[in-house]
Amino acid sequence: MNYPHPIIAREGWPFIAIAAVIALLIHAVGGFGFAWPFWLLLVFVVQFFRDPQRPIPAQPNAVLCPADGRIVAVETAHDPYANREALKISVFMNVFNVHSQRSPVDGAITKVEYFPGAFLNAAIDKASTENERNAVVIQTASGKTVTSVQIAGLIARRILCYVRAGEPLSRGQRYGFIRFGSRVDVYLPLGSRAKVSIGEKVYASSTILAELEQ
């Protein structure tokens, strides 16, 4: 079952209200000829904060995509948050993607750790280690460790995370949000099988990133 939430993310309500008030005031004073760019801005803000429900695949060993976007890395890398070698899959989100983050697996959170950092272009590799980021480490019922890392970007400078260590997470459960373009890295146990490739467009909760080794 998908985690219930408004179709327009709560994180965007203040921005939408401000954009709507500005558009209305300018329209009232100068008419549509002056106000249309601000109405266009309002439409952009609303679409940015959309947060639609998504179908969740039923395969028990599937690792779901935590965010909408495009795959920019599928590689073996060191997972500094769980201190291991891992399969790393990275998703880059541009300003037109949905920006909520959802849990890739069922499990219990063993660690939530925030790191201040830079605001480099989130599409480049060194954003993984140099940018502001927040790591959520999850242990599945079978003992597998999955790390999901929210990473700020050039424009995105606000990471929101709503979970803490010790709490359970369900696959597809909404646990965070990053405003205005960003990246999510997922670290999986070696032996996991990637089901996506670089450049592929992916969707939170409904795209299978990988399959855990059984």
UniProtKB/Swiss-Prot annotation:
GO cellular component: plasma membrane
One Gene Ontology biological process: phosphatidylethanolamine biosynthetic process
Catalytic residues (positions): 182
Necessary cofactors: pyruvate
GO MF, one example: phosphatidylserine decarboxylase activity
Subunit details: Heterodimer of a large membrane-associated beta subunit and a small pyruvoyl-containing alpha subunit.
Record protein name field: Phosphatidylserine decarboxylase proenzyme
Gene name in the database record: psd
